[in-house]
Amino acid sequence: MVKGRQGERVRLYVRGTILGYKRSKSNQYPNTSLVQVEGVNTTEEVSWYKGKRMAYIYKAKTKKNGSHYRCIWGKVTRPHGNSGVVRAKFTSNLPPKSMGSRVRVFMYPSNI
């Protein structure tokens, strides 16, 4: 039996930043969030992330299932603008305290 890890590390996710809810001048739509993915700057680069899963991980005061950490899952739906921002729908709407915090954008499911 071999101890330790052999070969290269596999990258499972990239980091993203939650910018806010999708909105117009006077209305906001909390069922869709805007996320800036690190290293993505154009609409063409966003197309690879379409359909990918993302997770907002946060820490709660009370334990559930033996852990203080909880997760809200989401999915990249489409690009937003020309600067590499994506629109994402989450299973439940993100809380307002999540604005500006990190999200994990996973490299699966693959559509290659």
Swiss-Prot record:
Organism: Arabidopsis thaliana (Mouse-ear cress)
Keywords: Ribonucleoprotein, Ribosomal protein
A GO MF term: mRNA binding
Stored Gene3D superfamilies: translation elongation factor selb, chain A, domain 4
GO cellular component term, pick one: extracellular region
Domain of life: Eukaryota
An example Gene Ontology biological process: translation
Entry similarity comment: Belongs to the eukaryotic ribosomal protein eL33 family.
Protein name: Large ribosomal subunit protein eL33w
InterPro entries: Ribosomal_eL33, Ribosomal_eL33_CS, Ribosomal_eL33_sf, Transl_B-barrel_sf
HAMAP family, per database record: Ribosomal_eL33 (MF_00573)
The UniProt record lists the keyword Ribosomal protein: yes
